[in-house]
Amino acid sequence: MPILDVEVVTRDVPLSVDTGALAHALGAALDSVPGSVWVRVRHLAAADYAENGDQPDPLPVFVRVIARSGDTGRWPQHARVIAAEVATAVRRPRERVHVIFEPDARGRVFFGDAPDSR
């Protein structure tokens, strides 16, 4: 189980993203069993995003990863493959995809009242 929340900052119309294809690509890239990678894509209007200085171009994409941390030494490798797959799916440069790993999800994610045991 990683859960990946992808937030795409957009200027106008929300970008069309094939979320299913992205989930499959991320699952393959992360060597995950089918059904264990979950992806949610949301859009954030550029008017609701700012950086100090000029507005960046192209606009950024943020990916929050909720997963069991396991070996945090693998995070750079995972960040690379996540950024590459997301960049392809949303048609943005990989450098504009920011991957953020949340704290270890062990004991924090439940299905109903049962903790995730995968």
Task: Put a short name on every predicted segment.
Residues M1-R118:
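Interaction-mediating elements
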